[in-house]
Amino acid sequence: MKIRTGTDIIEISRVKESIESTNEKFCERVYTEKEREYCENKKMQKYQHYAVRFSAKEAIFKAISDELDNKFEINWKDIEILNDEKGRPYVNILNKKIQNIEDIDISLSHCKQYAIANVVVIFK
């Protein structure tokens, strides 16, 4: 068993600018439909929720990059960050080529200016 960690922090204003300057094309490229629906339902804090999901995906990329076979590319939407019925975040890996992950623990936080994510990935 191998364990890797990943952490990422981002300014929320950068994500907001990316979304607004591309007329949502950024969202379509980076976030799944379920992620977009969740963030859009947050109204006043939607950019914080978009940013923390972006940060989470970056943290996961950092944690798994050394363990992946470079024969295939990982896309942003191969990793989905959702929340359970109690509001706790969890990760769905949608790319079937990523088979050697046993579990991913995730912690997300955001404030007015920053979003941060920390992940612990356990490999089989």
Pin down the residues of each PLM region.
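Core catalytic alpha/beta fold that binds nucleotide/phospho-ligands
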Residues: M1-K124
